[in-house]
Amino acid sequence: MNHFELFGLPLQFQLDGSLLSSQFRDLQRQFHPDKFAIASERDRLLAVQKAAQINDAYQVLKNPISRAEYLLVQHGEDIRGEQQTMQDPMFLMEQMELREELEDIADSSDPEDALFAFEGKVSKMYKQQLSAIQQELESEAWLEAADRVRKLKFIAKLKNEIELVEDRLIG
């Protein structure tokens, strides 16, 4: 049973987050190990394993990057944990320029405004990549979607770096 089946969801990238959360809570209640406290040792072990499976599946499905990776795995493209280098030199150049721009923000005349504007630009890029991933997965363009997920990971990492800079500027 795949993660989508476990939660009674269609095998697709776009999902209803509130339905996912609701199904998660229902499954947690149904398979909570405490409900099996007086059951046989075997049933207790199965409940613990099922609870772990539910938690793992929820973590995968609630995150758009891991959800896209999981969908790709379901269709024969496993890019999880790969160390493949990005083959798009234009994208890599853009990423280097963005990181340089982020480094320069601390030295700008108004670093907080500069960071806010930069964060908006990167968030827009992130949303554009998500939208493109959804379209590519819907059209079953698995290789293109895999490349797009790789790019999205770069942008997600940049978003994390923005948060670190923000913490340094504020704190």
UniProtKB/Swiss-Prot annotation:
Keywords, sorted A to Z = Chaperone
Q: Give yes or no: UniProt keyword Chaperone.
A: yes
> What Gene Ontology molecular-function terms does this entry list?
ATPase activator activity; protein-folding chaperone binding
Q: Name one GO cellular component term.
A: iron-sulfur cluster transfer complex
Family matches, as Gene3D superfamilies: DnaJ domain, HscB, C-terminal domain
Which positions fall inside the J domain?
2-74
The record's InterPro entries line, in alphabetical order, gives:
DnaJ_domain, HscB, HscB_C_sf, HscB_oligo_C, J_dom_sf
One GO term of the biological process aspect: protein complex oligomerization
UniProt key word Cell inner membrane:
no
| One Pfam family this sequence matches | HSCB_C
Oligomeric and partner information: Interacts with HscA and stimulates its ATPase activity.
PANTHER family, per this entry? IRON-SULFUR CLUSTER CO-CHAPERONE PROTEIN HSCB
HAMAP family referenced in this protein's UniProt entry, alphabetically: HscB
Tell me which family the UniProt entry assigns to this protein: Belongs to the HscB family.
**What is its biological role?**
Co-chaperone involved in the maturation of iron-sulfur cluster-containing proteins. Seems to help targeting proteins to be folded toward HscA.
According to UniProt, the name of this protein is Co-chaperone protein HscB homolog
At the highest ranks, the source species' classification is:
Bacteria, Pseudomonadati, Pseudomonadota, Gammaproteobacteria, Vibrionales
